[in-house]
Amino acid sequence: MFETNYLAGGRLDPPFHPTKTEPFIPGFIMDSFSFQTNETTYTLPADMELYAISVSASIYELDDKWSLIVNGQTVCQDIYTKRIPEGMHFMVYKAVAAGSTITFRFHNQGILDKTVWFELHFLR
């Protein structure tokens, strides 16, 4: 027997389905220096839901990796770069309040300085 637990025309519960509807994708560029860890911090201007990140670099070296930290909680830890730009979609929509901080950290393990681009994908 099949039983419906949601009203027709209703919505599914978060965090697996969003509560916000408008896309907002800020882009960032940063320099990353040889054998250093560099980071950029973004403060949210409004309540939003984070659902993905896109990362690209001017040069890819074997041990380069990145991390994403939301309000001190690590969401992505030591993700090694690939030879192409990448996007990572989360399995949930992470609610993040206005004034919260999101830190992108790039660990340049190579001998070359590089430029790193990343975008944070939100709904607001």
PLM regions and their residue ranges:
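Beta-strand-centric surfaces of beta-sandwich/beta-rich domains
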Residues: M1-R124
